[in-house]
Amino acid sequence: MKFRFPIVIIDEDFRSENTSGLGIRALAQAIETEGFEILGVTSYGDLSQFAQQQSRASAFILSIDDEEFTEGPDTDPVVLGLRAFIEEVRRKNADVPIYIYGETKTSRHLPNDILRELHGFIHMFEDTPEFVARHIIREAKSYLEGVQPPFFKALLDYAEDGSYSWHCPGHSGGVAFLKSPVGQMYHQFYGENMLRADVCNAVEELGQLLDHNGAIGESERNAARIFNADHCFFVTNGTST
């Protein structure tokens, strides 16, 4: 299943015909050619507003030109705004990739606390847009895969693999609903993914709920880690309990 997590580009010159605008649009086009959606924003405004998109984005690219900086990093509005943006993003999301796009000398204006939070610095015109796009997409995909907890990731793979599901004889993976008009409506309303993912407590690809192995066992251990517990066990209400 292809989830919608665009790469967000924040650049005041995104639609301009200057050097910066042409460069960032070439990068955006290269990313779109690789199959990733781009959300281009042309106004910085309050960067903290864009930070709220951290749950919907697969990566952020912020374009900053060298001439935008003023003397003194402690009071520079660009540095202060960038720091506030990063702090707001990292407050809720420690892993989403953040890139700065700028000139070669732009990075010297940025203090270490900002540089530490970046996944990379993209030097304008130093590499081809196609290469930079592939690098950013690799990091974005790695981030999205890391977001998925063990069982959900295994369930996604199972549902996408075209595996026949006979675990629920009441609907047989949704097939039974396709035999009547109202069933078709039900199928279209809830979607095939929900019905194909309706499985029993013991699927080889997912693990055994009673034996705590496979993706189920891995998820139980992950849940125990999150809740700082010694053990965590999943149960379901039915014959398996």
Region roles according to the model:
Residues 72, 102-121:
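Alpha4 helix (beta4-alpha4-beta5 surface) of REC/receiver domains from two-component response regulators
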Residues 56-59, 115-126, 130, 230:
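Conserved acidic residues
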Residues 192-241:
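Conserved N-terminal alpha-helix of the aminotransferase class I/II PLP-enzyme fold
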Residues 20-25, 44-48, 56-95, 107-109:
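Conserved phosphotransfer microenvironments
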Residues 13-15, 66, 100-107, 127-128:
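Short beta-alpha junction loops
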Residues 126-213:
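N-terminal "arm"/small-domain region of PLP-dependent enzymes with the aminotransferase-like
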